Every structure is written in structure tokens, then in C-alpha cells.
Amino acid sequence: MASTAGGAFGFASGLIIQEFGYDDDVDETLRQAAEAETGTTLVDEDYEDVADSAIVWWRDDDGDVDDLTDLLVDAQANLDGAGLIWVLTPKARTTGAVPAAEVEEAAATAGMHATSAASMGQHWSGIRVSSRGR
């Protein structure tokens, strides 16, 4: 698994990033890194316009693989074109951890695929998900 020092998502400047699953346990440093990369403020899940990419914070107690599939479908529907989605989960062997296989299964069921994985900060892992055509 690659490491992203400081949370480099690979977002381009000016992109609108929609955030799903925000709670008090998210890594503010990662959020700030995404905002620094784009030069824009993250928009929440109630944002009513199209976004370029998305960040999904997902924990074990947020639901099962079907719930994650539904959320990925919703996130993809809000994207302009085939934007990327980062699914961030607590690291393995920590409270709320989600097996990477669950994220991969949810992505496949949603018609997407996991393209890479990375260590995202001290407490989170990230799986980059994109549409199959990408």
C-alpha cells in the first residue's frame, strides 16, 4: 500500500470535491490537504450541484457492503463525468476498520473498480475508486 504523506489525493486545482460521511472522527489534516490541492472548500453531501470528485469517510458501523454500494452509486451520480472517489476507512486493526475487500466488492457492485490503495495519514486508509471506463 502506497503512503501519501500529508494526504496527497492527486486532485487538480479548481476541482469541486464533495464529502460524504463527515463526522467528528475525520482527519482534519486530510481535509485540509484536499482543500489545499484544489484551492476550494470541500462541499457536503447535501450539495445540489455537480462535483468533480468525492471523498467518502466510511467506518464499519456506518453499514454493510450494500450500504456502501448505495453510497458509492449516489456519490458517482453527483459527479461531472467520471470523477474519482476516495473511500477513506479507519486503518486495519483499529476501531471502525473496514476490510479493503468490502470496499472493492461495493465498488464492483456499483459498476466501478478500486484502482489503488494508500495510507492516508496516521489513522486512515484510502482506496481510490473510479468508473470502469477510466
Located regions from the model:
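S-adenosyl-L-methionine-dependent methyltransferase catalytic core, i.e., the SAM/SAH-binding region
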Residues: 1-134
